[in-house]
Regions:
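Conserved N-terminal catalytic core of the sugar/cofactor nucleotidyltransferase
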Residues: 1-2
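Conserved active-site carboxylates
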Residues: 6
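Long, positively charged amphipathic alpha-helical accessory segments at protein N-termini or as interdomain linkers
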Residues: 9-148
Length: 148
């Protein structure tokens, strides 16, 4: 997992997840968008794309039933969302254990500013915790430029 919304296999992005909260008189709702590279091959893509992305097909040489995949994805999302209240801290510990940034030096572009530091993980608000220049930065948005 690469904060804020990428799912990686090795160093290659296979999925992106965007979540937006919407509030109305009827209550709050989450709008969740998932983009998953499934049955496409990136073999013919430009070299810069192949360096940072992959697909399930490229990894397994097998196609998947997209309807079954969608059903399973929805089941897993429902399960995870229902566990958020009772297991929130546990789930963030799990998230940090699979984050490719935790325990590494990271550079994040936030607007015109480049913020670099040692990543302590992701807090319960979803902020990336970077320790740089003697202070802890809590980033709620940005683009990860590099990590090493």
């Amino acid at each position: 997992m690469k904060w804020p919304n990428d799912v990686l296999i090795g160093q290659h992005k296979v999925c992106g997840i965007l979540v937006e909260q919407h509030s109305a008189k009827q209550g709050a709702a989450l709008i969740i968008g998932v983009g998953l590279n499934v049955n496409n091959s990136l073999a013919g893509a430009p070299a810069d794309v192949r360096q940072c992305a992959t697909s399930v097909f490229d990894l397994t040489a097998e196609t998947m039933d997209l309807n079954q995949l969608l059903i399973e994805l929805i089941r897993q999302l429902e399960k995870t969302i229902s566990q958020l209240q009772s297991r929130q801290m546990e789930m963030f510990a799990e998230l940090n254990s699979v984050s490719c940034l935790t325990g590494r030096d990271v550079s994040v572009q936030v607007g015109d500013e480049l913020i670099a530091g040692f990543c302590h993980g992701i807090d319960s608000d979803g902020c990336l915790l970077l320790d740089g220049d003697g202070r802890l930065n809590r980033l709620n948005a940005g683009t990860v430029v590099s990590w090493w």
